[in-house]
Amino acid sequence: MGYEKFTWVIKNFSSLQSKYINSDKFVIGGCKWFLKGYQNANYLSLFLMVATSKTLPCGWRRYTRFRLTVVNQLSDELSQQRETETWFDQNVVLSGNRHMISLTKLNAKKGGFLVNNEVKIVVEVDVLQVIGKLDVSEGSQEVTQPLKRIRLNDDGVSVKQSIDVNGFQVLPSQVESVKRIFERHPNMALEFRAKNQHVRTSCMNVLLSLIDTLCQSLQDISIDDLGQAEKALRYLKDSDFKVDWLERKLEEVKEKKMEEQIGKSRMQELEEELKIFKQKCSDIEAQLEKEKQKCSDIEALLEKEKAKSLAAARAPPLTLDDVV
């Protein structure tokens, strides 16, 4: 198929509010992708990710070779590049490099990587093998699957069946959770000015749904779920909820999920390396058997020559009659 390229320019890099940042989505090889970067300790980590990971059909796999490049805008020769080959599937939805470039080198004045507070990243993707189909065209905006949205209603339950907790009408099943939240974060809604009870209930449902998401196991949370959680958090902050504590928890979960995905990707890479190594060992063993057979044949030939030589040595000496 050959390489196809996507260029990502990260603007205002030095003033990013989050450790995590995503590129726009792009389509290569009939699949929608995006790039994810995050500042991990002393490095910028960079990964290629499947954008529609939660809606992939069963059996979907792509064997992909790709190159990630942090472009040096002063000299192409100084650009930082990493190349990877790996399978993407329903379990492994990202692959890349945790130590793409050191933050010291990236932020260096006149280093060429950060110019006008912009970082330029290029990914070149070559889909080598395709298993399963995913109908995504260059012009399509999304896979034809409904987007998951955090519910903003109360599932049709009437206000008469709700209970007031700190000025919020909540369901009986939500009372204990809401009380506990306000006990630990009493100032959470002090600046929340909405008077409409439907709006207030909607905001509380968003908050509870977000907390439910964060309480799931890492195996059950998808990358898409975390993307929806980020949107929910922005909605709450825009509504003047004080949810810094929740933002920190979301960052922790995102980091753990990223580590889990990186671990899966690394395991797959090691499995591929082990497979290649075992094949090499098998080839060496086969060659060794051939050499052993050659050695055995030579030993047999040597024994024959020894027998001939011994027989010749034991022959009686010639007599005068034999000579004359």
UniProtKB/Swiss-Prot annotation:
Alphabetized UniProt keyword annotations: Coiled coil
Domain of life (superkingdom): Eukaryota
Coiled coil as UniProt keyword: yes
Family matches, as SUPFAM superfamilies: TRAF domain-like
Keyword Coiled coil part of the UniProt annotation: yes
InterPro entries: MATH-CC_domain_protein, MATH/TRAF_dom, TRAF-like
Coiled coil regions in record: 241-309
Domain MATH intervals: 3-125
Protein name: MATH domain and coiled-coil domain-containing protein At3g44790
Source organism of the structure: Arabidopsis thaliana (Mouse-ear cress)
Lineage: Eukaryota, Viridiplantae, Streptophyta, Embryophyta, Tracheophyta
